[in-house]
From Swiss-Prot:
Family, similarity comment: Belongs to the cytochrome P450 family.
Protein name per Swiss-Prot or TrEMBL: Aromatase 3
Ligand binding (heme): 435
Function: Catalyzes the formation of aromatic C18 estrogens from C19 androgens.
The keyword Cytoplasm is annotated on this UniProt entry: no
GO cellular component: endoplasmic reticulum; membrane
Organism: Sus scrofa (Pig)
Required cofactor names: heme
Entry keywords, A to Z: Heme, Iron, Membrane, Metal-binding, Monooxygenase, Oxidoreductase
Length: 501
C-alpha cells in the first residue's frame, strides 16, 4: 500500500488535482478582490465598469480618439439615454433623455461647464470670457454685457448690417471662387459672419482673410485641448502648435482692441458708438473687469459666428440644393413677404417657412449637438442620484432624433408643421446658461438665406450631400475641409422668373 502511494502515477494525479483546486481558489480570490475594489464605484447608472481604474482610462481615451460628439453617441447607443463614463478620472453623465435635459437646463446649479483647467488656461478661457468660464461669479459678471449687445438695439441693427455685409461679399464673389467657378461657401460665410460681428461689436477695420484663418486655428486649438489630460501639458512639443495658434489670434485681437481704446480716448462724442467693446472697456476703467477678461470677451464675441454659424449655413445651403421642393417653398415665401425690396426687421416674424427650415436643418444636421455642464450641488435626476461635482454632457442632437418628431431620421419640414414643445427641441439651450445669442443668430440666418437665395440658386458638385459628406464630430460637427467637393455652384437667378412662384 505504501508502494502504491509512492507510485509516480498516483503522485502526478494528486499534484494535478491540487493545481486545479489551487487555480480555482486563486480565480475566486481575484474575483473577490475585483468585486471589493469596484464595490465603492458601483453605480445604479448604466455604463462601463471601473476595472481597477482601466475603465476610466478607456472612456477618456475614447473621447480623445473619436471626438466628444461621436463618443457621446457611441456611449448612449451602447448603454442607453442616461449613462455614466469617466473623463479625466471624474464621473461624467451622458444624457439624451428630454426630461433629464429639461431638468438640468432650467436649474441654476448646472450653470458651470467643465474641461481641462490647463487646456482652458492655454486658450484663455479659464475664468475669462463667457463660453467656458467655469467661475460662476465671473461668468455672471460678464454675461450682461453679451445679453445687452445681442438683444434690443443690436438685434434691430443686425438686419441692416448683415444684409449690407452679404450684399457686399456677393458683389465680389470672385474672391472665393476657384478656377472652375465653384464657390468656397465656408470661406464666404466666415467672412460675412466676421464682417457683421465686427461692424456690430468692435467697429475697427480688419483683414478678413487673415483673421478668418486665425479664428480657424484658435478653434482647432480649443477643440484639441479641451479634454486633454494634465500629462499632455508636461510635454511642450505636443501642444506648441496649439499654443502658437492661440497666440496668433490673441495678438491680432489685442491690436484691434488697442486701436479701439485709442479711438475711445480721443473721441469727442461716444453716444452713437457705445457698442459691445466700448461697454467692456468702460467696465475695465471702472475696475469691474480686468484687461485680459475684456480682451477674451471681445475675442469670443468675434469668433462665435465664424466658428459655428458659418458651418450651420453651409449645411443649410447643401440641404436646399438637395431638396428642390423645399427650395420652392422658401422662394415662394421670400418673394411673397419681401419681394424685390430690401429685407426689413418687421419681415422676421413673417418668414415662417424660412424659420421652420432653419429649425429642421439644425435638428437634422446640427453643428453644436451637445452641451457640457457640471453639477454644483447634489441632486436627483429622473430617479438617479447625481453628486456635486459630477460632469454632465447633454446629447441634444441625439435627443432631437429620439423623441416627438414624426420623421426623426428624415429631413422634412413636416417635422415642424406643428408647434414643437421647447422641451423636445433645444438647438440653443434654455434656462440660465442658454446661448446668449440665440435670437440674433436666428435673425442673422434669416437675413443671409433671404438675401443669398434671391440672387442665386445653389447647386452641389457631383450630387454631394450632407449625408455623404466626411465629417468630424468633436467639440462641434464640421466637414473635413480637405475632403473635396465642398464648394458649390452659384447660379444667378432671373428675378422675373422667381416672382412667378
Amino acid at each position: 500500500m505504501v508502494l502504491e502511494m509512492l507510485n509516480p502515477m498516483n503522485i502526478s494525479s494528486m499534484v494535478s488535482e491540487a493545481v486545479l483546486f489551487g487555480s480555482i481558489a486563486i480565480l475566486l480570490l481575484i474575483g473577490l478582490l475585483l468585486w471589493v475594489w469596484n464595490y465603492e464605484d458601483t453605480s445604479s447608472i448604466p455604463g462601463p465598469g471601473y476595472f481597477l481604474g482601466i475603465g476610466p482610462l478607456i472612456s477618456h481615451f475614447r473621447f480623445l480618439w473619436m471626438g466628444i460628439g461621436s463618443a457621446c453617441n457611441y456611449y448612449n447607443k451602447m448603454y442607453g439615454e442616461f449613462m455614466r463614463v469617466w473623463i479625466g478620472g471624474e464621473e461624467t453623465l451622458i444624457i439624451s433623455k428630454s426630461s433629464s435635459i429639461f431638468h438640468i437646463m432650467k436649474h441654476n446649479h448646472y450653470t458651470c461647464r467643465f474641461g481641462s483647467k490647463l487646456g482652458l488656461e492655454c486658450i484663455g478661457m479659464h475664468e475669462k470670457g463667457i463660453m467656458f468660464n467655469n467661475n460662476p461669479a465671473l461668468w455672471k459678471a460678464v454675461r450682461p454685457f453679451f445679453t445687452k449687445a445681442l438683444s434690443g438695439p443690436g438685434l434691430v441693427r443686425m438686419v441692416t448690417v448683415c444684409a449690407d455685409s452679404i450684399t457686399k461679399h456677393l458683389d465680389k464673389l470672385e474672391e472665393v471662387r476657384n478656377d472652375l467657378g465653384y464657390v468656397d461657401v465656408l470661406t464666404l460665410m466666415r467672412r460675412i459672419m466676421l464682417d457683421t460681428s465686427n461692424n456690430l461689436f468692435l467697429g475697427i477695420p480688419l483683414d478678413e482673410s487673415a483673421l478668418v484663418h486665425k479664428v480657424q486655428g484658435y478653434f482647432d486649438a480649443w477643440q484639441a485641448l479641451l479634454l486633454k489630460p494634465d500629462i499632455f501639458f508636461k510635454i511642450s512639443w505636443l501642444y506648441r502648435k496649439y499654443e502658437k495658434s492661440v497666440k496668433d489670434l490673441k495678438d491680432a485681437m489685442e491690436i484691434l482692441i488697442e486701436e479701439k481704446r485709442h479711438r475711445i480716448s480721443t473721441a469727442e462724442k461716444l453716444e452713437d458708438s457705445m457698442d459691445f467693446t466700448t461697454q467692456l472697456i468702460f467696465a475695465e476703467k471702472r475696475g469691474e473687469l480686468t484687461k485680459e477678461n475684456v480682451n477674451q470677451c471681445v475675442l469670443e464675441m468675434m469668433i462665435a459666428a465664424p466658428d459655428t454659424m458659418s458651418i450651420t449655413v453651409f449645411f443649410m445651403l447643401f440641404l436646399i440644393a438637395n431638396h428642390p421642393q423645399v427650395e420652392e417653398e422658401l422662394m415662394k415665401e421670400i418673394y411673397t413677404v419681401v419681394g424685390e425690396r430690401d429685407i426689413r426687421n418687421d419681415d422676421m416674424q413673417k418668414l415662417k417657412v424660412v424659420e421652420n427650415f432653419i429649425y429642421e436643418s439644425m435638428r437634422y444636421q446640427p453643428v453644436v449637438d451637445f452641451v457640457m455642464r457640471k453639477a454644483l450641488e447634489d441632486d436627483v435626476i429622473d430617479g438617479y442620484p447625481v453628486k456635486k461635482g459630477t460632469n454632465i454632457i447633454l446629447n441634444i442632437g441625439r435627443m432631437h432624433r429620439l423623441e416627438f418628431f414624426p420623421k426623426p431620421n428624415e429631413f422634412t419640414l413636416e417635422n415642424f408643421a406643428k408647434n414643437v414643445p421647447y422641451r423636445y427641441f433645444q438647438p440653443f439651450g434654455f434656462g440660465p446658461r442658454a446661448c446668449a445669442g440665440k435670437y440674433i443668430a436666428m435673425v442673422m440666418m434669416k437675413v443671409i438665406l433671404v438675401t443669398l437665395l434671391r440672387r442665386f440658386q445653389v447647386q452641389t458638385q457631383q450630387g454631394q450631400c450632407v449625408e455623404k459628406m466626411q465629417k468630424k464630430n468633436d467639440l462641434s460637427l464640421h466637414p473635413h475641409e480637405t475632403s473635396g467637393l465642398l464648394e458649390m455652384i452659384f447660379i444667378p437667378r432671373n428675378s422675373d422668373k422667381c416672382l412667378e412662384h
